[in-house]
Amino acid sequence: MLSRKKTKNEVSKPAEVQGKYVKKETSPLLRNLMPSFIRHGPTIPRRTDLCLPESSASAFSASGDGVVSRNQSFLRTPVQRTPHEVMRRESNRLSAPSSYLVRSLADVPREYGSSQSFLTEVNFAVENGDSGSRYFYSDNFFDGQRRRPLGDRAQEDYRYYEYNHDLFQRMPQNQGRHTSGIGRVTATSLGNLTNHGSEDLPLPPGWSVDWTMRGRKYYIDHNTNTTHWSHPLEREGLPPGWERVESSEFGTYYVDHTNKRAQYRHPCAPSVPRYDQPPPITYQPQQTERNQSLLVPANPYHTAEIPDWLQVYARAPVKYDHILKWELFQLADLDTYQGMLKLLFMKELEQIVKLYEAYRQALVTELENRKQRQQWYAQHHGKKFLS
């Protein structure tokens, strides 16, 4: 008897397992991991409009209390609902896109469970003084579980659904009812889920926040007309030599230890003069006391013996400079000879000045002598004429 080969559709279908599925405990570490579609959003078209096969649908309906998918199929007749229920489901569907709703509690990291922004978006409620937290989930929450891609991930999807279903079973029965205005999970942007630390940082002057059509948060720099995905003060650290100081008197400011100054503006933020605040602290550099008098160091070449050839070179005309091969000297020797030439030049200037000074003194002496002679001549010749 010939064996019939399996077609592609039959190979892709998950194998049916007879019996009851056993719940697999999800590791707490894996629950804290955020899936990639929450961090970055859907980057490729997801096949979310496909309907579940009958085999998987029966497995879901056994533990899902008869939840029916929102997508209509020609193989099954649509479920008859009351007009009030249809209007409520349509309002929830339009208020939050299903592609950005939180799929399950395991998809959200636990550290956001205690943050204020996530609490408001999951809609905790406290009624009649009861401090116990009440969870309310919309129909989109269950529809998102039914619309996940099929294939080799069918058992994983069932594990997520069973985990959420067990959470509902552990809740009291009186806490599962819907209240007005709380039975809807709002569409949380990706920027709110990933940038909780940047919300605490203030935006520099000229910056604003906006969201894309898909709900991703970005920052606009109106000073340079540019956009950025990350916070302007979060993506860059402090430059070397800077320190952030949190003072109860002056607030948070930044200190530049290199230039000894302080400012409120982040050193990496763009400077807008009309928005810049005055510095919190004015540094006054301490003047060092001069205990010792400043002494000019003596010229070491005053006592050095100057070579004869260097004295000849200093007095020789410029046309003989090519005779010396300066490239044969070492650099240290050239520095030494340069200092000696400066010393000879200073001595020559000193000698010239002394010669001019001696000449000036001789002129002054000659003038004084001539004046005395004229006075003496005038006195003696005057007495001779009078006698």
Swiss-Prot record:
List Phosphoserine occurrences by residue. S95, S138
Q: What is its main location?
A: nucleus
Q: Which SUPFAM superfamilies match?
A: WW domain
Cell compartment(s), UniProt: Nucleus; Cytoplasm
> Where in this chain does the record put each SARAH domain?
323-370
Biological process terms from the Gene Ontology for this record are: cardiac muscle cell proliferation; epithelial cell proliferation; hair follicle development; hippo signaling; intestinal epithelial cell differentiation; keratinocyte apoptotic process; keratinocyte differentiation; lung epithelial cell differentiation
Post-translational modification as stated in the protein's UniProt record: Phosphorylated by STK3/MST2 and STK4/MST1. Phosphorylation is not required for SAV1 stability and may increase the number of protein binding sites on the scaffold molecule.
Q: Does the keyword NADP apply?
A: no
Q: Which GO terms describe its molecular function?
A: identical protein binding; molecular adaptor activity; protein serine/threonine kinase activator activity; transcription regulator activator activity
| CC terms in the record's Gene Ontology section | cytoplasm; cytosol; nucleus
**Which InterPro entries does the UniProt record give?**
SARAH_dom, Sav, WW_dom, WW_dom_sf
Keywords attached to this entry:
Cytoplasm, Nucleus, Phosphoprotein, Repeat
Q: Which CDD domains match?
A: SARAH_Sav, WW
Q: Where does the WW domain start and stop, copy by copy?
A: 201-234, 236-269
- As stated in the Swiss-Prot or TrEMBL entry, residues carrying the post-translational modification Phosphothreonine are T212
Kindly state the subunit structure of this protein: Homodimer. Stabilized through interaction with STK3/MST2 or STK4/MST1. Interacts (via SARAH domain) with isoform 1 of NEK2. Interacts with ESR1 only in the presence of STK3/MST2. Interacts with WTIP and AJUBA.
Functional description taken from the UniProt entry: Regulator of STK3/MST2 and STK4/MST1 in the Hippo signaling pathway which plays a pivotal role in organ size control and tumor suppression by restricting proliferation and promoting apoptosis. The core of this pathway is composed of a kinase cascade wherein STK3/MST2 and STK4/MST1, in complex with its regulatory protein SAV1, phosphorylates and activates LATS1/2 in complex with its regulatory protein MOB1, which in turn phosphorylates and inactivates YAP1 oncoprotein and WWTR1/TAZ.
Q: What is this protein called?
A: Protein salvador homolog 1
Which species is this record about?
Rattus norvegicus (Rat)
Organism phylogeny: Eukaryota, Metazoa, Chordata, Craniata, Vertebrata
Gene name, please? Sav1
